[in-house]
Design a protein with these regions (language model features):
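PRPP-associated nucleotide enzymes
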Residues: 1-186
Length: 186
């Protein structure tokens, strides 16, 4: 798929590249202050958080390590099934560690709630969430997200790690999927 074909899939640009990067630098500065004197373990939630985590990590001025988890509640559809599965677990023991979960988007909160309970049972010293995007109107369960990049409306977003059918992740901005490509019922 060419860049032109990718961009044809975008209805609107919701958050431009410069705005994204500026906010990520702000989050990095805030995290660097909040975690000063401590080493933080960034846990990226695959696949969507890869771009955000890489840029966030580069903006930090504190020691950090990274690890990844892959979890799913979507299967092959665009709506959460409510059944959460761990597809890839952590390689690092988090007991006694300061853990920051890095998420691309918090939607219903169901998947993140499951993940937080799972990680909390491993007895980290601290456990917080940093999400690039949150859709508060979609929340079905209250999950504390301490660090938020942007609150967005309930629209199907793509780009900057977010996909539709594994496409559009590599766009440098967050866009809205073109209405002609929107799955029924979304």
């Amino acid at each position: 798929m060419s860049q032109a074909e990718l961009e044809q899939g975008v209805g609107d640009i919701l958050i431009g590249e410069e705005e994204l990067q500026a906010r990520i630098r702000e989050l990095g500065a805030e995290l660097s202050v909040d975690y000063a004197g401590r080493e933080v373990l960034l846990v990226g939630v695959l696949k969507g958080a890869v771009f955000f985590m890489a840029d966030l990590m580069r903006s930090l001025t504190i020691p950090c390590e990274i690890d990844f988890m892959a979890i799913s509640s979507y299967g092959a559809s665009t709506d959460s099934s409510g059944v959460v599965r761990i597809l890839k677990d952590l390689d690092i023991n988090i007991e006694g560690r300061h853990v920051l979960v890095v998420e691309d988007i918090v939607d219903s909160g169901l998947t993140l709630s499951y993940l937080m309970r799972n990680l909390e049972s491993r007895e980290p010293a601290s456990l917080e969430v940093c999400a690039l995007l949150t859709k508060p109107t979609r929340r079905e369960i209250d999950v504390p997200v301490r660090y938020i990049g942007f609150e967005i409306p309930n629209r199907f977003v793509i780009g900057y790690g977010l996909d539709f059918a594994e496409r559009y992740r590599n766009l440098p901005y967050v866009g809205v999927l073109h209405p002609d490509l929107m799955p029924e019922g979304v």
